Amino acid sequence: MASPRHILLINGPNLNLLGTREPQIYGSTTLHDIEQAAQTQASSLGLRLSTFQSNHEGAIIDRIHQAAGFSPSLSPSGAAAATTTEAGAGPGTGVDKLSAIIINPGAYTHTSVGIRDALLGTGIPFVEVHVSNVHAREAFRHHSYLSDKAAAVICGLGPFGYSAALEFAGRHMKL
């Protein structure tokens, strides 16, 4: 039996504060709740899902590289710079080839050429997700460095956006 397709869900800066940070914009659902619902949905779709959250751009880039089978960079102390919640894989374990990435880059959406280049450099298809409607917010949030290269962009659906992204990745992307 073939192993299930593997999808990585990446959440960027401040998304660990979901549920308490500006609930009038982001709602009351926590990142843990979103990840648990995504795990349940992935299982029902026959997918393997790994989750990762970091407030640090370099750690996100390292995790994207790792997703394509490249070893993560090491900090000056020699420790791996990125962490992951999946069992049996993680920094320093070598190849971790994925079928797709679902990414909510948070504020890095509007600033990170590095994350864009990492996604493009790995060639792994990705879906960009935002809890809020970034186009209905401040002008500086209207530009995304990722959207023009994403297989799909989902914004303004609240936590359901993650479910829609997972459904799209699992059923409609050529993985």
Curated annotation (Swiss-Prot):
CDD domains tied to this protein: DHQase_II
Sites annotated Transition state stabilizer: 21
Segments traversing the membrane: none
SUPFAM superfamilies assigned: Type II 3-dehydroquinate dehydratase
One Gene Ontology molecular-function label: 3-dehydroquinate dehydratase activity
Recorded metabolic or biological pathway in which this protein acts: Aromatic compound metabolism; 3,4-dihydroxybenzoate biosynthesis; 3,4-dihydroxybenzoate from 3-dehydroquinate: step 1/2
Keyword terms of this UniProt record: Lyase, Quinate metabolism
Catalysed conversion reaction: 3-dehydroquinate = 3-dehydroshikimate + H2O
Pfam families tied to this protein: DHquinase_II
Binding site for substrate: 104, 110, 117, 131-132, 141
HAMAP family registered for this protein in UniProt: AroQ
Known function: Is involved in the catabolism of quinate. Allows the utilization of quinate as carbon source via the beta-ketoadipate pathway.
Subunit structure: Homododecamer. Adopts a ring-like structure, composed of an arrangement of two hexameric rings stacked on top of one another.
Record-linked PANTHER family: CATABOLIC 3-DEHYDROQUINASE (PTHR21272:SF5)
Name recorded for this polypeptide: Catabolic 3-dehydroquinase
